[in-house]
Amino acid sequence: YNNLGNTFTQLKKFEEAEVNYNKAIELKPDHAEIYNNLGVALDNALKIDKSIDYFKKAIQINPKYINAFYNLGNAYLYLEKYDEAIKKYSQILELNPNHTRAQQNIIDILNFHTVDNKNTNSIIVANNNLKKIKSNFTFNHSSKITDLSNFFENSNKIIQRHNKDLTTINTQIYRLNSIDLGCDRHFRVFNKFKLIPKFCFSCFKIQIEPTSVLELFKLFFIFDELKLPKNNIRKCFVELRPDIPGTYKGLIYCSSTGEANEIIKIITPIINKLTDSRIKIKRGCSEFSKLFPEFEEINKDKINFMKYKNEWEEKEKIIDATKIKNFKVRDTLGGLSISDVLIMNNWLNYAKEINDLTYKNIDKKIFKSTFISEKLSNQLDIRKKNFLDLIKKTKINL
């Protein structure tokens, strides 16, 4: 019955799964795995409160059942009970200090949720200490590179003091608002049907291309301090998508070209003061333009300006008919977080791999990221070329 329940769960037939798990429980009422599996089925069916009872029962039977702790933490996370979620992830780390998913979930929560200073989890202690560091680097005056270097060095020391082996596979630093753009949903539509969702036709981005990792760090601080009328979503990242050219990028999300142009007026003096980055407006995601080149056109008065095809709407409805567990988006807390520092270390590894020597201006003793090395292994030559091309275009002698 347990195996049959697992099969129905994989087929997304959650009611049938629940029936079979309950039959299994009747036969083996002290079997922790069955309770956990039933909780997973209920969780996927969005019966979150009910799933929590079964995860707790599984833990009651087996107090060292890590999967049940993890699933319970995720259920609390979905319900926005962040302190409860962190408590469960922390209990996992007491059982297995190297459980990377529990570590990452705590790190992610700390991007938008403040935890009591009394919490003794080493990740939280490090994050709270990072919040106390004051940076001399700001876009309001002429800052020195040494200010940036000292700031990062002090931040890294805090993490190493509390979590020597802590890493992340994330490479993008976001400054989010509470508006969910639905990007995961839109890519499900695109990947399944090879069409561009209607929402994305009104999505425009200001793309900023820093010329080095040093410039990317500067852009991060600009984005962190930037005050915009609508607190637009923004992010800094290194390019790792195999078919998308470029190296270092920053994006500000806008709902129209008009809004993008207004924001460009605000940010251009700041960007030009601290960096040599190129600024442009682009439409939607780069993956869309690979399949539909005309989607790149941002001038609606041009003949080749692409418009949404109404027949695509029925395909979108197919995706929307599928119940998906969507976590609520919340405003990112200002200031440096442990997530930011770990991602910055990945940026420095990326820079070292592509021969961008400006990483030495920030920190010569970077911590090796096997994740970055593996991600770049099949695209290292093209990234090195992208970097050299960027230098030539901006006429910068690094």
Set out the residue ranges of the language-model regions:
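Helix N-cap motif at beta-to-alpha junctions
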Residues: 212-213, 254-261
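Conserved alpha-helical positions within TPR/SEL1-like repeat arrays
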Residues: 2-10, 21, 33-44, 67-77, ...
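Charge-rich, low-complexity segments
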Residues: 78-80, 96-218, 235-237, 298-398
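Short amphipathic alpha-helices in soluble, non-transmembrane regions
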Residues: 219-223, 263-272
